[in-house]
Amino acid sequence: MQTIEQQITNVIEESLTDMGFELVLVKVKGVNPKVVEILIDSLNGERISVEDCTKASRTISAILDVEDLIEAAYSLEVASSGLERPLVKFENYNRFLEREVKIKLKELLNGKTRYQGKIIKAENNKIYLKCEEQEVLIDYDLIKNANLVLTEEVFKKLLKQ
């Protein structure tokens, strides 16, 4: 049986893609009323604006009303995934090659559960990170969560835009 988050993902992802957005994360919290949090990013690398979030929110709201997946009243929150966005799909790692990432693992790897480094490559369900002076190979299935890191280099690029 799929979780409510998976069900919501299934019914909204294609529409968001058609609008030029990547569905980054769906989270349902609370009881009465439930809060449906949705994080989006731009497929073309541009910044997500308030108008983008409003457009996406209207579309998602209409779909959720038709699909009737959530039984009681709920609040819908649509936001940009942000500069330190979560990496929740394997494909995300290839999109953000050479970017700094923080990774938390489900279990120990080389005596550690946390790694931070630059993504070198992602292939065959493995993530290759450059951590300080060594390369670390992480099986994607071991990753509990991962987020991009806002570095000085990224910040400077943003200022130039």
UniProtKB/Swiss-Prot annotation:
Similarity comment: Belongs to the RimP family.
Protein known as: Ribosome maturation factor RimP
Keywords annotated in UniProt: Cytoplasm, Ribosome biogenesis
Domain of life, source organism: Bacteria
Chain's role: Required for maturation of 30S ribosomal subunits.
Record localization: Cytoplasm
Major localisation: cytoplasm
GO cellular component, one term: cytosol
GO biological process: ribosomal small subunit assembly; translation
Matches recorded under PANTHER family: RIBOSOME MATURATION FACTOR RIMP (PTHR33867:SF1)
NCBIfam families linked to this entry: PRK00092.4-3
Keyword Iron listed: no
HAMAP family: RimP (MF_01077)
Matches recorded under CDD domains: YlxS_C (cd01734)
